[in-house]
Every structure is written in C-alpha cells, then in structure tokens.
C-alpha cells in the first residue's frame, strides 16, 4: 500500500475472488455467485433488487454532481486546511465520541490504516481512525462514523452473545447507524453550532474567526474524490455504485 504497488496485491485478490465463487457454488448453487455473497452482508438482497435502486440514484446524482461542479458558488473551505497537532485531533475526536454516548469503559479508540469498528462483545468494542496533520476533519468524521458503528455494537444483547438474536441484523442496518451520525447529525447546522466553540478552543488559530454557518458550508462541500471514506454525501454513493458495477 505504501509503495502503491497493486501488482503485489492482485494475485491474492484474484485468488480470493475465485474462492468466493467456488464457495457460492457449494453453498447456494441455486443462485448466482454474486447473489450468494451479497446475502452474507444484506440478507435477502439480490442484484435484481439492488440494480434498479442504483440506476435510480445514478439518474439523479450524476446531473446533480455536474451542476455542483459547474456552479458559480463555491463555499470557502480553506480554513479546514492547516497544521493540526495529532494529539489535539485525538482529544477532540474522543470528546465528541463520548458526547455521542460511546462508553470508553467498554471500548477503546486506536489508530489504523483504514478506519473501522470491531470487537468481540458489547463490553469490548474497538473503533479506529487515522490522522493527517493537514486535515483534522477527515479523522474527526471517521471517529463520528465509527462511533455510530460502536454504539450499535455496545447496544447489542450481552446475554446469548453466541446466538443469532445477538448478531448485528445486517450490514445495511449497521451502516445506517454510522452514516446517520456522520451525515444527518455531524453535518447539520445544529452540530456546527454546538461544536464550533470546542473546535475553536482546540484550534484557535484557524477557527476563532469562523462562524457556525461557515463551518456548516465547509463540512458540506461536494467535490469528486478518489477515496470513498473521504467522499462527501453527494458523491459517496457513486463510489459504492462503481464498485458494484465493477464486481
């Protein structure tokens, strides 16, 4: 990854895809191998159900993305770039995660190459993020997103943890919790009003003169990007759709 050498990874990925196809042939020979694998993540979902939804999204999103790119109005987000000390980023993320309800006596937050949430039990839930010195918002919103997953995990049944009733219902339900917090809550005017003082206290040189409205516009800027987890609310679905079509 650090050397950007996909050629080293490609043979392993090829083998994995071949094994997933073989697995599907043994486990669910009555359906396509892709439908069998979809069912692992979203029970009952099939290409026949998903494709029309994605086609509908594409018909609306592609013109919208084009209109945004061609718009004369471009919100100022320059103050979101700078030099943000990593320990301050960590403290800010932890504070907001706690405010959301994540119980650190039943979980922890660490650093990883790619943000994720995991753990073996509702009393041991692990969330991770990654830090960039020049962009604190990437880490903060990763923390918020993964805390959404973590809250779902910490809310699962403690009794009968090995039984189906204690399992996460589906990937879609799980992702609905993380994206609800990240998009609906953390990109809202109310969130920006509530947390601008804390952000300004953490990074005064950048945010002392910034209004909540400016912050709200900056965290909602929409522009195409190569990285799914860094994508905005408008372009994010296109990352998912593109992967689906490639697969």
Feature-to-residue mapping (PLM):
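Active-site-adjacent bridging/hinge elements
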Residues: 117-126, 150-157, 212-221
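Long, amphipathic alpha-helical stalk/connector segments used for oligomerization, subunit docking
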Residues: 187-247
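Hydrophobic/aromatic-lined pockets within catalytic cores
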Residues: 42, 62, 66-69, 73, ...
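Acidic/polar loop patches that form or flank catalytic/metal-binding clefts of enzymes
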Residues: 105-106, 159-163, 186-197
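Contiguous, non-catalytic segments that form substrate-binding/exosite surfaces or channel walls
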Residues: 1-136
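Secondary-structure capping and boundary motifs in well-ordered enzyme cores
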Residues: 12, 85, 119-123, 132-140, ...
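Glycine- and acidic
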Residues: 73-79, 125-133, 157-165, 226-231, ...
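Active-site recognition of the HExxH zinc-binding catalytic motif
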Residues: 28, 131, 138-158, 175-182, ...
């Amino acid at each position: 990854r650090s050397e950007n050498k996909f050629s080293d990874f490609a043979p392993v990925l090829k083998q994995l895809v071949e094994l997933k196809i073989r697995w599907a042939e043994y486990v669910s020979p009555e359906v396509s191998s892709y439908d069998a694998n979809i069912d692992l993540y979203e029970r009952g979902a099939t290409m026949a159900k998903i494709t029309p939804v994605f086609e509908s999204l594409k018909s609306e999103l592609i013109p919208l993305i084009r209109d945004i790119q061609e718009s004369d109005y471009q919100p100022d987000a320059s103050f979101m770039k700078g030099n943000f000390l990593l320990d301050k980023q960590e403290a800010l993320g932890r504070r907001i995660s706690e405010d959301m309800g994540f119980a650190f006596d039943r979980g922890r937050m660490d650093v990883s190459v790619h943000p994720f949430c995991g753990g073996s039990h509702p009393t041991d839930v692990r969330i991770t993020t990654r830090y960039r010195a020049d962009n604190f918002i990437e880490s903060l919103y990763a923390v918020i997103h993964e805390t959404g997953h973590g809250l779902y995990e910490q809310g699962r049944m403690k009794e009968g943890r090995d039984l189906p009733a204690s399992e996460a219902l589906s990937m879609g339900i799980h992702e609905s919790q993380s994206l609800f917090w990240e998009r609906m809550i953390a990109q809202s005017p109310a969130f920006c009003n509530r947390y601008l003082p804390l952000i300004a206290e953490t990074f005064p040189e950048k945010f002392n003169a910034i209004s909540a409205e400016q912050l709200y516009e900056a965290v909602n800027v929409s522009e195409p990007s190569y990285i799914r987890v860094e994508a905005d609310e408008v372009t994010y679905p296109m990352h998912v759709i593109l992967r689906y079509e490639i697969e």
